[in-house]
Regions:
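A nucleotide-sugar donor-handling region in carbohydrate enzymes
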Residues: 39-95, 99-102, 130-131
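Short alpha-helical segment that forms part of, or immediately flanks, the ligand-binding pocket
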Residues: 161, 179-185, 204
Length: 239
């Protein structure tokens, strides 16, 4: 919204002469997104249009519920067996994808330990992003728990869609882009935590649609294990 506000101000002051399109990359829109001199609002999903029209007075002719743009590879056909073979993973094991880079170091270490203790028969893909400290600490924890053969620890990756395609569940914070990519892959979500504001709104959207569960602080690991073992529930969440 900050960039949109800046562009709106520059247009009002006749300092730029360009079309302005506001792409709302979350599943709810706050007042801060709505400013004059915007030619189009692109929404993540159609139901958001009602709020823009009724509450914020946006002209429906400039509202386009086209979705958040992502790469085509998230929706393209894939070969699970081939991906698993290339990545050294077992295609027959329940697989949990943990997007650990967005969590605090201490919390994700204890959370992974709890998962490993409760589900040693499952396999885990843990992506830390560019968090070097977290990567190093997780290496130690994985060795301590004896889960080297059942855990693939990754730093920054450019093919996250492959890991989404072969996973049964993703554990993540509900950022707009990750949510969209997971939905495109029909990947059920377990929401680790959600800050008030856009993340909380995204979480509410997913919970209302039945595409995610919200993990409880003390029993989050149990929630995940129980869900992954409930194939019927997982299939419902994919729809």
């Amino acid at each position: 919204p900050f960039v949109t506000t800046m562009v709106s101000k520059l247009r009002r002051q006749h300092k730029i002469d360009v079309k302005a399109i506001s792409l709302i990359t979350d599943y709810d829109a706050h007042r801060t997104y709505i400013v004059p001199y915007v030619d189009a609002y692109v929404l993540a999903e159609p139901d958001m249009a009602t709020k823009l029209i009724d509450e914020y007075g946006v002209d429906k002719s400039i509202i386009y519920p086209l979705g958040i743009p992502i790469f085509d590879r998230f929706t393209e056909p894939f070969d699970k067996k081939a991906i698993c073979e290339r990545e050294g993973l077992d295609p027959n094991k329940p697989t949990i994808l943990l997007m650990a880079g967005s969590f605090g170091v201490t919390s994700v270490l204890s959370f992974y330990k709890a998962l490993a203790e409760r589900a040693p028969e499952m396999q885990f893909i843990v992506i830390t992003g560019r968090n070097i400290k977290l990567f190093a600490n997780l290496e130690k924890v994985i060795e301590e728990t004896g889960m080297q053969d059942n855990t693939k620890l990754l730093y920054f990756v450019k093919n996250v869609e492959d890991y989404m395609h072969i996973s049964d569940l993703i554990v993540t914070k509900p950022g707009g882009l990750t949510v969209t990519e997971s939905l495109a892959c029909s990947l059920p979500m377990a929401i680790y935590s959600a800050f008030p504001g856009q993340e909380r709104d995204n979480a509410e959207f997913l919970l209302n649609k039945g595409a995610a569960i919200m993990l409880r602080k003390k029993t989050g690991a149990d929630d995940i294990v129980n869900l992954v073992k409930d194939k019927e529930k997982l299939d419902e969440m994919k729809e």
